[in-house]
Amino acid sequence: MSIAKNIENDPSKGWVVQKFGGTSVGKFPIKIAVDVAKEYLSTKRVALVCSARSTDTKAEGTTTRLIRATEAALRPAVGSVHDLVRIIETDHVQAARDFIQDVGIQDELIDAFHADCVELEQYLNAIRVLSEVSPRTRDLVIGMGERLSCRFMAAVLKDQGIDSEFIDMSHIIDEQREWRNLDASFYAYLASQLASKVTAVGNKVPVVTGFFGMVPGGLLSQIGRGYTDFCAALLAVGLNADELQIWKEVDGIFTADPRKVPTARLLPLITPEEAAELTYYGSEVIHPFTMSQVVHARIPIRIKNVGNPRGKGTVIFPDTISRHGSATPPHPPKIMPDDISASLANKGATAVTIKDTIMVINIQSNRKISAHGFLASIFAILDKYKLAVDLITTSEVHVSMALYEESDDGNMHEAFVELRRLGTLDILHGLAILSLVGKHMRNTTGYAGRMFCKLAEAQINIEMISQGASEINISCVIDEKMAVKALNVIHKELLEPLALHEVPSQASMLVEKPWLYSA
């Protein structure tokens, strides 16, 4: 009887890097293996990058539990380190039993989980003894979530007949080298290191930890919790991949939040600038810094749905450069049919989004300092207390700023005390930022006027208005209670009419392919 050969990567094919979030790994591991990875292996070489497992919410995800365990090590009153580690181990062992059929693969995985959790508890006990945690130790603790998740996903792939290899990226940075700055040369080095580790496994399908290190100053401090996306982006760059895929539990990027706007439509194509604006103003797309790494390398990004793997998704690509680096005018690359390029260039607005839980701070100068000194003092205070401003409008003696209201309360209170020394302080709570985004709105006259007129007709008052010099977004601050109404009004008046002039049908052919650009 012949034994079926496991599926593996074909070295003659181009790479696709697929990043999966923690909830996808937690809820859909078989779908990832069978409907996504195995499907793409027929046309591409595939590398998987996974976040730490979650089940339903990030609040009960592995990363959150690891953060809680770190706090327990520092402050025993928070909880038992041993109990928290056992919860993490038990959760992963149960997942192994639920999703893996082969007893040998299952037992090997459970043994590896136990060894990882013993190591994790040693790190936490060291924190407890020293009563402090360094950035490096914190990274080692948090990175354990990705290690457990990727071991699990590699085992699931093996169980489904895919020759996979777990790759731990937690020590890819040469500790003998000193990096004074995390600049372009550092990220180029990281991309090269990630790619080297992946290509070293030959034709096996690599399952890569989204955590990588050890980054000078700490990965969480320097990159933040979006480090898994960043790892996938750098790996795509290092492999010169044909495409980076970000797999979520939504079909892609919509013209508005479909949970709040029933008529919202899936966007087949969007520029990086538009995606960055939507991310910043409330829509979870992909971090702009992560996106810039891939865009600079001229690699398209595709947002796809694990629950609907055959869906078209949304492609993010730069519309000012082609895949081969030749400069183009400010419209989609000429590799697309002319009618698609023309349609995209004339579409105007792309999407509308809301960012809730906003406060507005109005500061009227007491004129004790000069106009430029007034502004400099405000920004110095914001920097001192690490307060990020979403929107700002200024005049010689007056500044209005919109900030996220759930920032550190202590820092915000201290900042208010210092700001009051500069003049009169007026604070408005319970607000939201409404943003209309579209790179090509500049090509159409009157978008701002139409937006504000429609809000006025709907009896929605505007507290503050802001528009950047790039004209890629028009934002205003409104009452949070009116946010959903405003979303629907603007979508109906400024985005639904565009559906009549949507990207031609050939564009759907582009987004149905496993990659955007063909040779």
From Swiss-Prot:
Keyword Manganese appears in the UniProt entry: no
Domain of life of the source: Eukaryota
Catalytic reaction(s) noted: L-aspartate + ATP = 4-phospho-L-aspartate + ADP
Entries under Gene3D superfamilies matching the protein: 3.30.70.260, Acetylglutamate kinase-like
Family from the record: Belongs to the aspartokinase family.
Organism: Schizosaccharomyces pombe (strain 972 / ATCC 24843)
A GO molecular-function descriptor: ATP binding
Modified residues annotated as Phosphothreonine in this record: T328
Record-given protein name: Aspartokinase
Coiled coil (residue ranges): none
Occurrences of domain ACT (ranges): 436-518
Transmembrane segments: none
CDD domains for this protein: AAK_AK-Hom3 (cd04247), ACT_AK-Hom3_1 (cd04934), ACT_AK-Hom3_2 (cd04919)
Biological pathway: Amino-acid biosynthesis; L-methionine biosynthesis via de novo pathway; L-homoserine from L-aspartate: step 1/3; Amino-acid biosynthesis; L-threonine biosynthesis; L-threonine from L-aspartate: step 1/5
PTM annotation (Phosphoserine): residues: S326
GO biological process, one term: threonine biosynthetic process
GO cellular component, one term: cytosol
